[in-house]
Amino acid sequence: MHSWKKKLVVSQLALACTLAITSQANATTYDTWTYYDNPTTALDWNNMDAAGTVDGNYVNYSGFVYYNNANGDFDQTFNGDTVNGTISTYYLNHDYNDATSNELNISNSVIHGSITSMLPIGYYDRFDTLDHDGYSEYYRFNNGTDTVDGNWYDGDVFTLNIANSTIDDDYEAFYFTDSYKDGDVTKYTNETFDVSEGVAVNLDVESNINISNNSRVAGIALSQGNTYNNTYTTESHNWDNNINVFDSTVTSGSDYILDSAYTTDTGTFGTGHFGNSDEPSDYTGAGDVALSFTDDNGASDYAMKNNVYFSNSTLMGDVKFTSNWNANFDADGDDTNGDGVPDTNHGWADDGLNVDELNLTLDNGSKWVGQATYTVDTTSRMYDVETNSLTPGATLEDNAWNRIVGNEVFQSGVFNVTLNNGSEWDTVGDSTVDTLAVNNGSQVNVSNSDLTSDTIDLTNGSSLNIGEGGYVDTDHLTIDSYSTVGLTESTGWSTYSNLYANTITVTNGGVLDVNVGQFDTEVFSTDKLELTSGNTADHNGNVVSGVFNIHSSDYVLNADLVNDRTWDTTQANYGYGTIAMNSDGHLTINGNGDINNGDELDNSSVDNVVAATGNYKVRIDNATGAGSVADYKGNELIYVNDVNTDATFSAANKADLGAYTYQAKQEGNTVVLEQMELTDYANMALSIPSANTNIWNLEQDTVGTRLTNARHGLADNGGAWVSYFGGNFNGDNGTINYDQDVNGIMVGVDTKVDGNNAKWIVGAAAGFAKGDLSDRTGQVDQDSQSAYIYSSARFANNIFVDGNLSYSHFNNDLSANMSDGTYVDGNTSSDAWGFGLKLGYDLKLGDAGYVTPYGSVSGLFQSGDDYQLSNDMKVDGQSYDSMRYELGVDAGYTFTYSEDQALTPYFKLAYVYDDSNNDADVNGDSIDNGVEGSAVRVGLGTQFSFTKNFSAYTDANYLGGGDVDQDWSANVGVKYTW
């Protein structure tokens, strides 16, 4: 029986095992409990007949395991068998012979019932419902012989191997019918003999239990049994238990009969649902035990060491640990020298030998759902032993003052839990352990339950998730190496903090994630939040810091914010902690007060208490296209409620907020948002009108080249022409910045008209171009279509006037990435009207050369539509006007090879002034996106006439010095003259 089901009275009945069980060589079904019925007399439970009695009425047990099975029960191997009832290894375990194997192997079998190392027991009045005498009535069974040796031998460990088998604790009672004569009438009584053990495996011997290959065991209880050995004197020993579970499941068992509804007459606790009764393995919540470890042997001098390992397995149920002082340990202390002051706790010199242990490890994706509980003896009167645990309460002075002096204690037992490699623990009820280590992507989920541990350590991407109704208490919480502790609105805190720790350390990429509402202070409580980073030497010179993330919370930290890091990169302790938040978040750091319960509001020069110390980066996590400058610029992010703070804060990143990027900036004991440059998407949106103008300017140059070439070389009577144009631009007006590539084609047709005072060329052209606009992550794909009418008048005195009118339509598809990685896109279109006018004089140099001074003016007037990007940035439709003024000179020479062939190279030099003073309205703010300034144009070109009617031409230009530099442009075309 478990320690939680105390026996009140013991009645022994030695029964001979008279029913022989056949060989276990073949798969067989066995029943360990049977009933011998005398049909003439009724069963008298209080005076049950002895086994083998002629004409008796008795329950018979045949389930003992022996090393050398000569008694007709079981040997040490079950393979493919089914057993109904209780298997007892009592005689196997107590045969202390070095030559015998203390091992039981169960494979490919089903045990409907339990295994025990004790003598089997059965209750006929477990709940005292028959005679109400205050006792539970039961019988204990043996084989009528004594054990070989009553001593305990340390190291003679019982090994139980369970492979591909089920032990379901589902034989909780032996049901039988007793018949008897009442006169000449045969009557029947239905009897229940309660043989439930509470779990499937119940052992009070040192044990190694190996469970593997998809096995299922409904609970294990290990207790420290007899440790007496008359040959042991002063040497130390340990009682060692090991449980290893691979690819299998351990569930809770059952203390009571479940296959009938509860009645006060029988004391059964089963329930029914659609015709099915509860099963022992049905975990119903806190109190339903799957693993139990009990050292309540008050006569033992030896500690009980329990190691439990689960790999790729499931544990469904509570884990219970009970520990008491060894018999040779004095918790109050002993005065050995008679001076009236205790000086020793006795026990073993090695403190570890005085302490029971339960070490539970979940590995390789194992999962545990259940409660961890322990009952241990504690003392704070430590004379020659060292602290091995902390109390969630307090230790007091051992005097009349009775003041709180700490939390350190010495316990009779410690319970440690470790999760490795993606394992999981979902806590239930009120769990208490000494240490909790969560490693390598594992997780602990605490909802509608409590978890208390002296220390909690999370490493390598692990997580502690505190959900609704979850509470976690610890002395020291360490969040290390990209692990996370999460607290959200759904946590549901009220009067008490859902997370309490005297110290919280966040480092090496760990995250304390607090995503709550406004003006919150109670979601977690701590005296000290250590937000720091690992040594750069351990991270190849990089800083990997811990993160305190408050999202959009308006959070008040009533704790000291500390680290020992400096901003000085030359120092060995260079590093920082990171405070992360959204732009609408706010952190107030109040500190936790000084030793006299003062606070950091004392700003005098003698105040030695600071609310924050160390070096920190402030990271803005959110990004949005919405909001004006007034919504962000100068907003307070952090307020340290202590002007004497020596903490340093600097920007960890830039965040895209509205049209601009912002970063954190320290101003005294506050940190505010500092406005920086345009965001990538805003930069692209504001650069589009200028980029449209660049395309149009290239088209202007293309039309101008056509008209210039008509005045030089062989005679030109008008014709048809086609020209490629392209170029690269770099724009920078101090606000916008971009790089642009353009490629396009123009086709035109014109004719020569002789006027009274001038010779005219009149024509029309169409242009098609694509542009690629970019800067950092910003990208714009441009399409334009243009229509031109143009003319040129050349007078007899060699003065000429060129002019054109144009209509253009521009389509622009914008995309970019925001600072948080979010993809942004949008599109806009605009219509534009333009003109060009050029006045010049062709000065002839002999028959073939010329120099042409000229002046020109051109203008483009765009009208765009209102549009909004996918991140909610709004751009009002902009009327964007651009004027260009140019003074220059062309010079060339025509080499004539025949009357049909000629080559005319030429050179161009000009001064250009762009006047484009424009502002755009973005999110309600006016932003300068005009480009202007003086520039110099340098160009080279040539025209070659292959025949009288067919010629080709090319030129290249550079223009630089203004807000927009044209790194290069090219114009390559052919024409056919009439």
Swiss-Prot record:
Residues 713-978 form the Autotransporter domain. The keyword Disulfide bond does not apply. Coiled coil: none annotated. The keyword Signal applies. One of its GO terms (cellular component) is outer membrane. It comes from the Bacteria. InterPro entries: Autotransporte_beta, Autotransporte_beta_dom_sf, Autotransporter_adhesion, Autotransporter_pectin_lyase_C, OM_autotransptr_brl_dom, Pectin_lyase_fold/virulence, Pertactin_virulence_factor. SMART domains: Autotransporter. Keywords: Signal. Residues 1-27 form the signal peptide. PROSITE patterns: AUTOTRANSPORTER. Disulfide bonds: none annotated. NCBIfam families: autotrans_barl. This is Uncharacterized protein YaiT. It comes from Salmonella typhimurium (strain LT2 / SGSC1412 / ATCC 700720).
